[in-house]
Design a protein with these regions (language model features):
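N-terminal nucleotide-binding beta1-loop-alpha1 segment
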Residues: 1-11
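Glycine/Thr-rich phosphate-binding loops of Rossmann-like dinucleotide-binding domains
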Residues: 9, 48, 98-99
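Conserved N-terminal catalytic core of the sugar/cofactor nucleotidyltransferase
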Residues: 25-84
Length: 181
């Protein structure tokens, strides 16, 4: 998981309290129930400490990969700390309403030999709340701004960028309180 400490539109959005826990923690907890190892890459020490306390493996992101950096170089950096993995399933920190079943589906597709799986909106535009990549595909990725997923999965979750998005997600998450989907 990539989890920046700052955000232009909604300051420190990943750290915002979402029904009793930082927003990013909703997906960390889902991933910890699904995957044997969960990695969190961040430029924020507090986020890394919280992730480690929850059971994830923290990866300190170097300054050259902070700011408006495409995700692929950040994933490639994180891959250096992941021994023996055949691929990654990256889940956005700011999409706390992702259904864990969708994450599991991405993992199953990766295990079946697909090299790139992403989520999409209902209008079929690429969303990327989940981005699964085989190790080989990730290591050899050419165009960071032009993903070519083999499989697109429909994801109705909300991506939080603004206070309005956060308020919407807060209402949804109240239904799940301490047990995220």
């Amino acid at each position: 998981m990539i989890c920046k400490g700052s955000s232009r539109r909604l300051p420190q959005k990943n750290r915002l309290d979402l029904n009793g826990k930082p927003m990013f923690m909703w997906n960390v907890q889902k991933l910890l129930r699904i995957a044997p190892r969960v990695y969190v890459s961040s430029d924020d020490h507090w986020i890394l400490d919280e992730a480690e306390w929850a059971g994830a493996i923290p990866i300190k992101r170097p300054s050259e990969l902070c700011g408006d950096t495409p995700n692929i170089p950040v994933y490639q950096h994180a891959l250096q700390f992941m021994n023996g993995v055949s691929g990654i399933i990256a889940v956005q920190a700011n999409s706390p309403t992702i259904d864990s079943k969708l994450i599991e589906t991405a993992r199953e597709l990766l295990d079946r030999g697909y090299n790139e799986i992403m989520t999409m909106h209902e209008d079929r535009s690429i969303y990327g709340s989940i981005w699964a990549l085989s190790r080989k595909k990730l290591e050899n990725y050419k165009d960071f701004y032009n993903p070519k997923p083999e499989v697109l999965l429909l994801d109705p979750s909300t991506d939080v960028h603004t206070k309005k998005d956060f308020d919407e997600v807060q209402k949804i998450c109240q239904k799940y309180s301490s047990s995220p989907r």
